[in-house]
Amino acid sequence: VEISEHLDALRREGALLADAAGRTDLDAPVPTCPEWRLRDLLLHTGQVHRWATAIVRDRLRQPPDEAATRAARGPDPDDAGLLGWFRDGHAALVAELDRAPAGLDCWSFLPAKSPLAFWARRQAHETAVHRVDAESAAGAAEPTATDPAFAADGLAELLTGFLVRPRGRLRSERTRTLLVRATDRPVSWLVTIGRDPVTVTEGAGAGPADCTVTGRAHDLYLLLWNRLPADRAEVAGDASLLDLWREGSPIRWG
């Protein structure tokens, strides 16, 4: 997926998120994130957008400290202005990434072809996952489908970027393997979970695994981001691995 495609996705997903939020009350619970109300979701996503905008705009070479993060986020809006505040922050992020040079030099935290490629990709998927949360809060029976190529790209970011970081919490006393295989894209990943940090092998469709999860890229994307139940995919083998996934895979920033 190219930078321009990630930017198109970021535009689209932010607009869909705002549209869903506008259809319900700020106190509406978010079923996909039970600890949140819609208000929390908008604040979180809007703050992340402003944080990312500041990193790109100011060409920061290291993570912003607490004071810089607070300055980037600005004051929280009141309820009456929250949705407009979200839309403004989303538009500013898209504009900043759109005008950034290809040779942008700034901090990033996952492997990528370039810092610009990283931030366009990360914010597109950040916004897409939270768009699903907003649709959940608005009572949608089904989330808006994501393009298979975009969903597969999101799976790759999650599995080969986030999941393999040394501080990841997904661990097992004995080595166990999970094969993730899409039916509508030629992609698969073999995830090895043990006492050490997770390892992931791409293109591992022929490899044996303790548990194999097969489905559309869209369903796998949301399942592995813990936004859909396991019954949305075909599960073969030791299904308890998916319980282990749900316990250990959520992203932690602390």
Give residue spans per PLM region.
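Active-site-proximal cofactor/substrate-binding loop regions of enzyme domains
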Residues: S4-R73, G81-G84, D88-G89, L93
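Conserved catalytic-core motifs characterized by acidic clusters
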Residues: P63-T69, L104-L110, T199
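C-terminal interaction segments
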Residues: G205-G254
